[in-house]
Amino acid sequence: MSGNNMLKIGIPKGSLEEATVNLFARSGWKIRKHHRNYFPEINDPELTARLCRVQEIPRYLEDGVLDVGLTGKDWLLETGADVVTVSDLVYSKVSNRPARWVLAVAGDSPYVRPEDLAGCTIATELLGVTRRYFEDAGIPVKVQYSWGATEAKVVEGLADAIVEVTETGTTIKAHGLRIIAEVLLTNTVLIAGKAAWADPWKRAKIEQIDLLLQGALRADSLVGLKMNVPAHNLDAVLDQLPSLNSPTVAGLRDSTWYAVEIVVENDLVRDLIPRLRAAGAEGIIEYSLNKVI
């Protein structure tokens, strides 16, 4: 295989690592990590993977060290890297929802609006984005870099407020902090280096990866339902069915019965199945989906 037919992909190390490896597994790529090794195996001879800090992946793509990778929209904005955003992949450490960078203060502080922090010190890992947020709002503050344990900075009296990322807000509340504003909504993005995107083979491979990752993410919120329905109840059952497309209806060997199959939102199932049963469906089977393209 020529070197041109090898795609170098950056897998985020840290909080997104497990969720990303699981997503690739559902998409058809098994990533096998080795202890203290930043070059995991992947079951595709056309891919070579590297574990990288999510903050560094945009620069590695810009410099051509990697061809494609996954990072956060937040770090793409922070670095200002000149790369191609292929797609949004809305998943995170614990959910398939975007995360938020929020402005938080001590629960008993007098600050209720960002404007109240004029002249104060803000601690954050997201320096550039935070500075631009306050500059755009015309609020003079001192923004300091936090090397970690950012929530503790206010508690320890090292900062008046923090800008920190959260999915649920639980950790921030646990530290006795109160959110007063949202600075940035962020999610995982698939990005490509410009040279890789301009290469026809690499672009096709990147688009293949994107298609299957998107399909696996979409499947997370969906389930399939199969059921048998007597002919005299068919219309009543079909009236209950939402679907991505029209449900599949096929006559069984016994011409008085039909097999019906649909794909529905997972959140609807607990209410839908009893209604289908009441409408006359029998032998209802629910099954999970791996990908929905």
Curated annotation (Swiss-Prot):
Pathway: Amino-acid biosynthesis; L-histidine biosynthesis; L-histidine from 5-phospho-alpha-D-ribose 1-diphosphate: step 1/9. It is found in: Cytoplasm. Feedback inhibited by histidine. One of its GO terms (cellular component) is cytoplasm. Its EC number is 2.4.2.17. CDD domains: PBP2_HisGL3. It comes from the Bacteria. GO terms for molecular function: ATP binding; ATP phosphoribosyltransferase activity; magnesium ion binding. PROSITE patterns: ATP_P_PHORIBOSYLTR. Keywords: Amino-acid biosynthesis, ATP-binding, Cytoplasm, Glycosyltransferase, Histidine biosynthesis, Magnesium, Metal-binding, Nucleotide-binding, Transferase. Its cofactor is Mg(2+). It is an enzyme of class 2 (transferase). GO terms for biological process: L-histidine biosynthetic process. It catalyses: 1-(5-phospho-beta-D-ribosyl)-ATP + diphosphate = 5-phospho-alpha-D-ribose 1-diphosphate + ATP. Belongs to the ATP phosphoribosyltransferase family. Long subfamily. Catalyzes the condensation of ATP and 5-phosphoribose 1-diphosphate to form N'-(5'-phosphoribosyl)-ATP (PR-ATP). Has a crucial role in the pathway because the rate of histidine biosynthesis seems to be controlled primarily by regulation of HisG enzymatic activity. This is ATP phosphoribosyltransferase. It comes from Nitratidesulfovibrio vulgaris (strain DSM 19637 / Miyazaki F). The lineage of its organism: Bacteria, Pseudomonadati, Thermodesulfobacteriota, Desulfovibrionia, Desulfovibrionales. The gene is hisG.
